[in-house]
């Protein structure tokens, strides 16, 4: 889930964007995992969902390997709306990689955040 104040924006090319609604310092946690809000799904659970729900969950989750197999995290709030950037201002650990000004779009690198993404491919644009 997002750990900073944000608002949604709109870009003609990207569509929905997540905009910082406060100044964020380099190294601050922009996103965090909170088990009270964020949901974790087992792959077998998702595989048995009806097609419409499975499609939604697969498109809105991040896949992580937890050492005992893959788990899918569905973050609470606007985090799934963050757009990809090969030079993101939020790193794969959820920290600001540089100072971010209020009004600036928050971006992440899908390849580093989701094990389903591979360098040179764009599976998130399905």
Which sequence ranges carry the predicted segments?
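Conserved catalytic SET/PR domain of SAM-dependent protein methyltransferases, capturing the structural core
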Residues: 1-126
């Amino acid at each position: 889930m997002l750990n900073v104040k944000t608002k949604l924006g709109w870009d003609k090319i990207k569509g929905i964007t997540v905009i910082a609604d406060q100044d964020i310092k380099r190294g601050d946690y922009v996103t965090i995992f909170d088990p009270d809000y964020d949901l974790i799904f087992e792959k077998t659970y998702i595989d048995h969902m009806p097609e419409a729900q499975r499609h939604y969950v697969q498109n809105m989750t991040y896949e992580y390997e937890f050492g005992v197999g893959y788990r899918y995290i569905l973050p609470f709030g606007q985090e799934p709306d963050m757009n990809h950037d090969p030079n993101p201002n939020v790193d794969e650990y959820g920290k600001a990689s540089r100072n971010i000004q209020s009004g600036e779009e928050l971006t992440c690198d899908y390849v580093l955040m989701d094990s389903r993404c591979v360098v040179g491919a764009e599976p998130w644009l399905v």
